[in-house]
Each structure stands twice: as C-alpha cells, then as structure tokens.
C-alpha cells in the first residue's frame, strides 16, 4: 500500500470529494442567495 499509485488515487478521491462538497455548499448554502436566476429575470 506504499505505492505512488495509492497516494495519487487517494489524493484524487479527496480532491473530487472536496470539489463536490464545495459546489453543493455554494449551490444550496448561504452563498446561494447571491446567485441570479435567469429564468426569473426573463419576461415573456
């Protein structure tokens, strides 16, 4: 288990998990109040 491939795979997994968690936080957490909704702005 002390191979470079193991550490690289672990690093990529943690990176992917971090990016996913941050995007969920931005999309649904407190910062989501600052996001604009283009469908709400559009008048028919």
From Swiss-Prot:
Q: Which HAMAP family does the UniProt record give?
A: PSII_PsbN
| Superkingdom of origin organism | Eukaryota
* Topology of this chain in the membrane: Single-pass membrane protein
Q: Give me the segments passing through the membrane.
A: 7-29
Q: What is this protein called?
A: Protein PsbN
Q: Which UniProt keywords apply?
A: Chloroplast, Membrane, Plastid, Thylakoid, Transmembrane, Transmembrane helix
Purpose of the protein:
May play a role in photosystem I and II biogenesis.
In which compartments does the protein localize? Answer: Plastid, Chloroplast thylakoid membrane
Q: Which GO terms describe its cellular component?
A: chloroplast thylakoid membrane
InterPro entries named in the record: PSII_PsbN (IPR003398)
Q: Cite the Pfam families for this sequence.
A: PsbN
Q: Which GO terms describe its biological process?
A: photosynthesis
């Amino acid at each position: 288990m002390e191979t470079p491939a193991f550490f690289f795979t672990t690093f990529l997994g943690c990176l992917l998990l971090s990016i996913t968690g941050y995007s969920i936080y931005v999309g649904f957490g407190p910062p989501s109040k600052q996001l604009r909704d283009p469908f709400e702005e559009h008048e028919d």
